[in-house]
């Protein structure tokens, strides 16, 4: 429950000469804190206390409770828990009540995936072909086969990169069809044959759409920003004579052509969390058994009690539940895991006011920018923020703010709470002022040519 403040008669506080020294010291304190000059009688501000006739600063809880009361009639809609690195509780309101964490769930998925797979794990998309390769005509006489395993990074940039490598391998024409596996996902939306059709209209310039043209321009910009080699600003691509897309029934023998390895999964995770991409979270969740696999990880590894968590999705959509204290356990676990693996928390989550995405325009005040590393969560009547804030006096402070209410208002309240905690902790300590996120994940992808030589005379 919120701490209620008793309003006292101002005459007891500002009596006159006998308390002049006390008045002077508190006047200085009030001015430093931005309170009105108390030289004339006025009611105490919410949270102020009188002890032995001396006006004392309000506690952190008093200040936060006062701000919450400005937004809600009850504190039951607000779950807060802040804890220092040495485990000391700093601030709490309903820490053991269950709230919907929304997209903060993605951090649960993040850690479950990273524990099972190396941070350097890459998705692999394999290209092979049926028939033969006519070197003189730079032509595959047969079908191009594309097999993938639900890679969330495959997009236009990936296809342009693959097309460039096909050209380098001496392939400019395919006389057969495109055969695709069921695990092929493109641009996070289309799968199977639908994805194959978009591959066809991207690799073959004669079939380009306006979307293809725009994507090519963006690809060139991303390569330039990443200082990747640009051999030509003109797209050559691959001509498909037949141009049909079929589901691969794996009935025909095929020869290896090349492999496309995605960016390391750690890079994928940072993008997912920065932009809070639900489709990425669903696909990453497949790697660990979906919601039940992530929930099992939270109970088995993070040591949450079964009653502290309930998951229906790996993205945060739907009716998930966790306590603020349980969320801070997750953040502490993430911190310890990162230290053990020599990875920074900023490799997992965006930096407030620095990285693109959901935190790009938050915590941009000079005393907070670069000091908050966190994950946002938003649903129609849910707003959440959890992560770690770096402070000058207390070092890292783990926190969870899980709230029910209009997200726009709750976001403002969250920033006020973070500001109050930072001020109480000597101020925020910026750890990064420039983003290391690139324009495209393709800059960290790799292509390996593996062609088995079967040439026609």
Residue ranges and their predicted role:
Residues 14-25:
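Bacterial N-terminal signal peptides
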Residues 115-130, 342-346:
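Short, well-structured active-site flanking segments
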Residues 31-86, 90-98, 163-169:
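Beta-lactamase-like hydrolase cores
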Residues 195-348:
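A small/polar active-site loop signature that marks catalytic segments
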Residues 87, 101-119, 178, 272, ...:
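Active-site SXXK
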Residues 45-55, 92-101, 144-154, 254-259, ...:
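Second-shell loop/turn segments in exported
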Residues 90-92, 285-457:
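Small-residue-rich helix-loop
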């Amino acid at each position: 429950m919120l701490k209620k403040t008793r309003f006292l008669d101002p005459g007891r506080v500002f009596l006159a000469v006998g308390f002049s020294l006390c008045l002077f010291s508190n006047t200085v304190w009030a001015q430093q804190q931005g309170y009105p000059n108390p030289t004339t009688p006025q009611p105490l501000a919410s949270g102020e206390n009188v002890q032995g006739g001396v006006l004392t600063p309000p506690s952190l809880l008093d200040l936060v409770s006062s701000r919450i009361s400005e937004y809600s009639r009850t504190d039951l809609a607000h779950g807060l828990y802040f804890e220092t690195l040495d485990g000391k509780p700093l601030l709490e309101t309903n820490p053991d009540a269950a709230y919907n964490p929304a997209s903060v769930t993605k951090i649960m998925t993040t850690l479950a995936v990273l524990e099972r797979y190396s941070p350097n794990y890459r998705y692999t998309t394999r290209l092979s072909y049926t028939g033969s390769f006519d070197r003189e005509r730079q032509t595959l006489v047969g079908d191009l086969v594309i097999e993938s395993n639900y890679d969330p990074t495959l997009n236009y940039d990936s296809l342009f990169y693959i097309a460039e490598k096909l050209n380098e391998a001496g392939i400019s024409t395919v006389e057969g069809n495109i055969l695709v596996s069921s695990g092929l996902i493109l641009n996070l939306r289309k799968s199977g044959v639908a994805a194959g059709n978009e591959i066809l209209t991207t690799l073959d310039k004669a079939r380009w759409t306006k979307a293809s043209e725009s994507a090519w321009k963006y690809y060139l910009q991303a390569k330039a920003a990443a200082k990747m080699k640009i051999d030509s600003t003109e797209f050559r691509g691959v001509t498909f004579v037949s141009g049909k897309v079929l589901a691969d029934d794996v009935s025909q023998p095929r020869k290896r052509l090349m492999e496309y390895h995605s960016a390391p999964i750690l890079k994928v995770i940072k993008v997912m969390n920065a932009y809070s991409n639900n489709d990425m979270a669903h696909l990453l969740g497949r790697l660990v058994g979906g919601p039940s696999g992530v929930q099992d990880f939270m109970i088995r590894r993070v040591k949450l009690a079964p009653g502290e968590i309930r998951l229906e999705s790996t993205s945060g959509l739907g009716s998930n539940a966790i306590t603020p204290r349980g969320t801070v356990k997750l953040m502490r676990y993430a911190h310890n895991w990162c230290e053990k693996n020599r990875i920074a928390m900023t490799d997992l989550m965006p930096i407030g006011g620095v990285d693109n995405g959901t935190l790009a325009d938050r915590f941009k005040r000079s005393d907070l920018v670069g000091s908050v590393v966190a994950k946002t969560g938003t649903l129609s009547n849910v707003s959440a923020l959890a992560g770690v804030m770096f402070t000058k006096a207390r070092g890292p402070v783990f926190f969870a703010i899980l709230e029910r209410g209009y997200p726009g208002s709750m976001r403002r309240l969250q920033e006020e709470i973070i500001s109050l905690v930072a001020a109480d902790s000597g101020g925020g300590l910026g750890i990064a002022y420039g983003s290391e996120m690139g324009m495209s994940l393709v800059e960290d992808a790799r292509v390996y040519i593996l062609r088995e030589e079967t040439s026609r005379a």
